[in-house]
Amino acid sequence: MGSLRFLALCRRSRYAEFLTSFFTTNNLSLETLGRLAQDALYFHEGPTAPIPQDQPRYHHQMSVPAGIRKSGPWVTCLSGLIATPTTSQWYLDRQGHLSIFHEKLGLIVTGANSKNQPELATFTEKIGGQVVHMPTSSRLKMSDEADQLGLAYNSFFAVLEVVPATDKRQEFHFVITPTGRLADVNLNLQLVLKAGETIETAAGRRVVLDEKPIRWSTEDLGNWIRHRGWTLKIPPGARLAWPIYPFNPYRNGPEIDLVLAVGTISCALTGKQELVLAVETD
């Protein structure tokens, strides 16, 4: 038992080292520095042990409908966790179902949850004047052929399928099946966009992101957008919005710092269909 505890401690040390390796002098906020300073009070040299993140490939499926897969430089996370909505600011709405991370480019698509912000939910449907942004049930199946997350809503069923990645491409699909008359339904992906960096589109749009709102239509986008070394291939009808400030439970309201803003790619769903998207690296 003692050796197992020691091994767990060594892995935690390596994981802390892994996380701090992503910090640079350009992305350290005062809040982050303060938290690191707190950790430094307890720092001491010690051994480390390999962790799954050090392996070229691995996957793990939890006992609940959530899992993670690493394929070379790519890490994808699927979450079908369902929780009863509450009014407490400390319990976020479990509305984000996909995250995509690249070891050199960082987080690209975030499945971060929020509060009272359906525009950041993976799916929304408007029924009887109300917007529903969380599934009623879910199921996750992970295999080497593909990872599939099924999500049930009131008027449709969606399967989010993540196919095996190559070194420079991670493809994923959304398969939509109406269960009756399809409500006003939208698909949304949260994109980790960085203020001060350039974003460009296949249709010729090119700007440096700042606090000015962007609401680009499908005519403005074309079939891809490019940002910070990655390109997102998007289906017809997609729209882009920036900036959107996620909910901060400590403020009990949206963030106010542009550094923490995200963008969204949204598509209106029209019936039984399959949407194919992919993230590619330069």
PLM regions: where:
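Beta-strand-rich recognition/accessory modules
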Residues: G222-D282
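Extended polysaccharide-engagement surfaces of secreted carbohydrate-active enzymes
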Residues: M1-R239
